[in-house]
Amino acid sequence: MKLHLKGEDLELYSPRIMGALVVHPGEIGSVEDFVRKAKEMQEDGADFIEIGLQVEEGIPEESDELTKLVPIVKAVAQNTSLYVAITTKYPSVMKSAVGAGACLIIDPDALKAKGALETVAMLKVPVCLVFDHNIDFDTEGSLDPMGDISAYLYERIDACLNAGIDRRNLLIDPSLSQSAPIESKLKLIGRLETLKSFALPMTMAMPRSIPHADNYLNEHFSAAVAACLFCVNSGVNIIRTERVAEMALALDTWQAVNKSARPFKLTKAIASRFKRKHAN
C-alpha cells in the first residue's frame, strides 16, 4: 500500500507517524515557533505533520484557519522535508493550504461541506475521511461502534468516487471523539481489522492518555502506547499523535522484535533515540 505525495510514492509497508501540531486561536507564538516544533517532531521520528486549529467549544472559524494555519503550513513546508497535512473542513482553507505546500488534507467532516468534494477532486491531493465525531454512543459502552463507522465511511467513499476523486487518493480514519466512552473506543480498536475490507490506508488519532478508572493509567501514557501497537498490528498505517517521541520509540521497538529483516539497523535506531533523550 502506498500514497502519492509531493510527486513520489510513499510506501506504507511499515507504520508511519504523523505529528499533530495544534494551534489555538488566541495563542501567542510566531510562525518560527511552530516550525521549530515541527522540526523537533521530525527529529523524534515523524514523517508527517498535521496542522490544525483547536477551539474549546464548537468548530474553528474559517477566517481563523485561513489567517492562523496557512502561514504555518507554508513555513513548515519550506523549512522541513515533512509531508504536511492540513486539518480542515473548509474548501477555501484546503485550497489555500495546498497552494502553500500541504500535500494531504484531513477532513473531520469527511467532505460533507458544500464544495468540499469538488475542491478535493480539483486539487488532486490525498484526503483522509474522518469518522463523524457528532455520532454519540451510549455511556455504558454496550454499543459496538463498528457498524456505524463502516456504514459512514462506505457512504463517504462512495460520494468521493462519484465526485471524481481518485480512489488512490483516499485514506480513512475511524477514530472516535474524545467524549466517546472508553468502552466503545476499546471495542473499535479490537475490531479494526474489519476495516481492511476497504483496502485503503488507515490513520488513527492516538490520545495523550486513554481514560481509565485507575488513577495511575489516567496520569500515564502506557495505555495509549499499548493501544497504538495494537492498532498498527491490526492494519493502521499512520498514527496521528502529539507524543511523537514516545510513539516512535515504541514502534521502533515493536518493529525490531516483530520483523526479522534488518534487526541490527532497527536496534541502532532505538539506541540513538535513547542517546538523544539522555543528551537533552
Task: List PLM regions with ranges.
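Short gly/ser/thr-rich secondary-structure transition/capping motifs
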Residues: 1-5, 86-87
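Active-site-adjacent loop and "lid" segments of alpha/beta metabolic enzymes
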Residues: 5-6, 12, 27-36, 58-77, ...
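Structural preference for beta-strand elements that scaffold enzyme active sites
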Residues: 16-20, 47-50, 83-85, 103-104, ...
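Conserved, mostly hydrophobic/aromatic
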Residues: 21, 41, 45, 105, ...
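Catalytic domains of carbohydrate-active enzymes, especially glycoside hydrolases
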Residues: 36-54, 231-234
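Phosphate/pyrophosphate-binding loops at sites that engage ATP/ADP/AMP, CoA/4′-phosphopantetheine
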Residues: 39-47, 156-169
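Glycine-rich phosphate-binding "P-loop"
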Residues: 48-50, 54-63, 77-84
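Histidine/acidic residue-rich metal-binding segments in metalloenzymes
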Residues: 96
